[in-house]
Design a protein with these regions (language model features):
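N-terminal targeting leaders characterized by basic, low-complexity, disordered sequences
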Residues: 1-6
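Solvent-exposed, non-transmembrane regions of membrane-associated and secreted proteins
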Residues: 9-16, 22-215
Length: 215
């Protein structure tokens, strides 16, 4: 009888350990595909996320001064016809390789990856900061591979010192992140480049990365 009790205890322990590892395995499987599941269940959340991304990111009564100091402005890089045509942003740390849309329609721009916020700077006209926005979680039609490649889902994994490259009209512009922040508004307008996305599905908090050009 005592042997059966000991056996039962060991059996219960093994069952508990089995359930523990099964739970860990399920979590590991679900995490990468959770955005896909969420947007399948709640397709309207994509609209809410888009609204938060394009919502005014400059706090009221803040005026952004143009960068007028010519001595610190870097030259436009040389034309390189071996580079891809069009406009792209690459973030090697998180393997992002996203097209940049210059569409006036933010909804259309965000569907294709990164959208450059209008009325701010561009690589060729950097008097104001370049502001690039993208979905964090994207659309239910996106595969996990596509989400990781063109969205800013993994932007929180980037930090100071990480590099960003913009390809713009067959010219290569390199930047380095110097500041990471979670906030409702942009707080540093001295940056050459600002990346941002939403933190959570319904959160007003955004994830910002501020970078300076290096080439």
């Amino acid at each position: 009888m005592e042997k059966q009790t000991i056996f039962q205890k060991f059996n219960n322990i093994y069952v508990a350990i089995g359930f523990f590892f099964l739970t860990i395995a399920l979590i590991a499987i679900i995490i990468p595909i959770w955005p896909y599941i969420w947007y399948r269940i709640n397709p309207k959340e994509t609209i809410k996320e888009t609204e938060k991304i394009i919502k005014e990111i400059v706090p009221p009564k803040v005026e952004i001064e143009e960068k007028k100091t010519e001595s610190v402005r870097l030259d436009i890089p040389p034309l390189n016809t071996s580079l891809p045509e069009g406009k792209f942003v690459k973030i090697p740390k998180i393997e992002v390789n996203s097209p940049i849309s210059t569409s006036k329609n933010s909804d259309e721009g965000l569907k294709n990856g990164t959208w450059i916020v209008k009325e701010y700077g561009t690589p060729e006209q950097p008097d104001l900061p370049i502001i690039l926005a993208a979905h964090r979680f994207g659309y239910s039609s996106w595969s996990t591979e596509k989400r990781n490649r063109i969205s800013y889902y993994n932007l929180p994994k980037t930090g100071e010192g990480d590099e960003i490259t913009i390809y713009w009209n067959q010219r290569e512009y390199k930047y380095k992140i110097y500041k990471s922040e979670e906030s409702t508004y942009i707080t540093d307008y001295s940056a050459d480049l600002i990346l941002y996305t939403c933190k959570f599905f319904n959160s007003p908090i955004r994830i910002f990365r501020y970078a300076q050009r290096t080439n």
